[in-house]
Amino acid sequence: MSKAKEKKEVTTNQGKKHLFGSSEKSDFILNMSAESAQKLCGVYSIIAVLVLCVITIPYYFTQNIKYGMDESVNRTLYLNEKFIFFISAAVLAVGFVGFIIFLIANMKKQVELKDNKSLIVPLAVVLLSVVSCLLSADIFTSFYGYLDRSEGMLTILGYWGLFAAGMTVTADDRRIKLSDFIVGIGAFEAIVGILQAIPATAKIVPNYFKEIFSAFSSGGMTYTKEYIATGFLCTPFALAAVLTVISAFALNGMLYDDKKARKIFYAISLALMTAADILACVVPAILGLGAVYVISLIIAAVKSGFAKDKKPFIACLVAFIVAGGIFAGLFAS
């Protein structure tokens, strides 16, 4: 090897750390650039959101597939009952990896634990779930979760990791891409929910919630078949919660983003999510969506007071009036 080449290799590796004295190839995490670290955080966050979106789809399409009988209570067992435990395990795995991503970002000084006090909030929820699990009548169900709820202690622990992973996305371009993807997921769930609420398409799009009490019909209980939006989130309450959060992304993106194409995308997505929230027919959807519009309207009013551009305030006011009119019309009917 020539002296020039040898000198070049020494210069390349100079000052770089290695895990356990290993080679450079095995410790890319320590040696990755700030841009590469942000790419890792951003890409993982998008993958995590995608996994959470599609993970319940098999649960929907296996709800009528029988695989056995529970002789002790003479109850038919369905394949979707098995998926609940896989869903909880998958959420935990995604959350665990998310927390590792957070630790990597902390190592790379992309995010500091001392500067992210908001992580205490989901941690408090985790601690409360531990107490709830220990005091529950059925610790097994409280730990793993069960049908139509699935939020056992393991699942909530996974959520904490997802919050931590989301905090690592600090670069503006990565945040915009993640926001675009989240709004796209919200629009997808909204479209599914709208199709579930239309009688003509409800037969094609599966909706577990509308059949949830059908087994009791023959036993004397009154069962009314309704067309209620749930998306692929099992219940209208879950759909309302998810769409409320994502609507905040869409509304403020529509108001303040500089690119016209993205404004249009956010506006269409917001309209779809508003419609799905209305068709969910639950009070949390109305309260949540109303809070999004009111808070965004206040922010737009404050910002417009210090700026010449009044368009965000006017757009938010129009959206608020239209949504309020739709809600009022539904209640009046």
Task: Show which residues each predicted segment covers.
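Juxtamembrane membrane-water interface segments that cap and precede transmembrane helices
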Residues: 27, 65-82, 139-142, 216-232
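Asp/Glu-centered strand-loop micro-motifs enriched in Gly/Pro and often flanked by an aromatic residue
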Residues: 29-35, 74-82, 108-115, 166
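Alpha-helical transmembrane segments of multi-pass inner-membrane proteins
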Residues: 3-8, 15-22, 33-54, 88-102, ...
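Cys/His-rich metal-coordination motifs, chiefly Zn-binding "fingers/knuckles"
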Residues: 1-2, 65
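Membrane-interface coil-to-helix junctions
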Residues: 69-86, 120, 125, 151, ...
